[in-house]
């Protein structure tokens, strides 16, 4: 009897796991989301922590400050992803060529559309056009664009610098992500019509950066 119970329990667990997987896929319906998060990645941190040898195109050649990591459809809590079935969506080469100036590589562009862009309900052309418009609407504080030495700052100080440079933003529209004790990203939230909007729980500041002070590596040593 105990063996039958054990087998039955395993079957129920397997069925539950399948149900969760299906639910997650169904939750990822294209076009079903509340707002976008524009993720601006601080390239010097990525290169210092993930690619110190300069193997990727992002970390060799001309130094970069903020690059576009992604433009993510979000729910107020949680997010959809990979809203397609079958083969990975095809991105036209002209779209890739247009985005390569603000995103650090072809692989990232393809990955971001497959994982996040498909959930926008937009074609690659329309999705990346929206991402570029959001990206270009944000002014990077002058000090960060030309940072020549490591800066020590609190997340709140970095946020205030962005608010000062972008009067259209409010405090609840911007979050700072860090780790380990370095600036990783600045995230700005946009409505579906590409207007700045309040962020949901996904951009909870206390969760994204627990450090009281963080280092901002320089663009140029």
Show the residue positions of the predicted features:
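Positively charged n-region of N-terminal signal peptides that target proteins for export
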Residues: 1-5
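Short beta-strand-initiation
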Residues: 6-7, 183
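Hydrophobic membrane-insertion alpha-helices, especially the h-region
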Residues: 8-21
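Generic low-complexity, intrinsically disordered sequence content enriched
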Residues: 14-16, 26, 113, 148
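N-terminal module-boundary/linker segments of secreted carbohydrate-active enzymes
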Residues: 23-53
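Domain-level detector of nuclease and nuclease-like folds
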Residues: 37-39, 50-221
């Amino acid at each position: 009897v105990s063996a039958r119970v054990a087998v039955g329990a395993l079957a129920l667990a397997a069925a539950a796991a399948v149900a969760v997987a299906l639910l997650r896929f169904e939750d990822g319906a294209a076009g079903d989301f509340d707002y976008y998060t524009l993720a601006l990645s601080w390239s010097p941190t990525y290169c210092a922590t993930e690619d110190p040898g300069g193997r990727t195109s992002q970390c060799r050649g001309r130094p970069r400050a903020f690059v576009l990591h992604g433009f993510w459809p979000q729910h107020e809590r949680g997010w959809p992803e990979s809203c397609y079935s079958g083969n990975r969506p095809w991105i036209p080469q002209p779209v890739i060529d247009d985005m390569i100036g603000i995103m650090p590589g072809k692989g990232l562009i393809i990955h971001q559309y497959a994982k996040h862009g498909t959930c926008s309900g937009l074609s690659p052309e329309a999705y990346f056009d929206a991402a570029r418009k959001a990206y270009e609407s944000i002014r990077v504080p002058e000090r960060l664009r030309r940072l020549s030495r490591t800066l020590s700052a609190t997340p709140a100080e970095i946020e205030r610098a962005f608010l000062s440079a972008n009067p259209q933003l409010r405090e609840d529209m911007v979050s700072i992500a860090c780790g380990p004790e370095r600036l990783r990203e600045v995230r700005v939230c946009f409505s579906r019509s590409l207007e700045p909007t309040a962020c949901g729980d996904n951009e909870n500041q206390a969760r994204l950066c627990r450090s009281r002070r963080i280092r901002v590596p320089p663009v140029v040593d």
